[in-house]
Amino acid sequence: MRWVRFIFLGMVLVVLPLSLYAAQTATITVTVTVRYISVAVSPNTYDFGFVDPATYTTATSDIDVTNDGNDTEDFKLQITTGPAAWTVEETSANPGAEEYKLLALFNSVAPGDIYVGDAPAEGTDDIIFESAQKNCDATNFSGDQDGDNVPSSGTINLWFRFGAPSSTTATNQQSIVVTVSAYKSTEF
């Protein structure tokens, strides 16, 4: 029996130093969120009603543009569908026959006189192009708001101004589709 105790004591003496050198552990939790880029507009229509030829008309209510994605976003604007009989005037000139101009401004309140002189005196910054998307940054479409680095759930106010053709044969209601595109905030 004594020899069993010696064997047991010998095993303890052999195993004990091993437990003193056992590895210590720590855990790492890795997290990830997949970026979700999304934009919503409300309402999704605006009716200028009747406008006179060769005049500019500013909207009386805004369109709310909301980043409903999960990260900060940049926005761009573009006319993606316009009236078949008209072309977009993308220069600082006033619209001529069968031409129109659609301008936009991000501003917390109705822009009022901010638009005065925008066409042709202030260039093309606020003109929505059909030929290409335009960044909604501090230069383009910016009043006291812009579409650069809009936080998740952030809403900015978009106001339109319509420049009517100097003359037209299209006397029925015309539709213009403006597309707001959202990009991750490093786009511009």
Give a label for each model feature.
Residues 23-188:
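Signature of Gram-negative chaperone-usher
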Residues 1-25:
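Sec-dependent, cleavable N-terminal signal peptides
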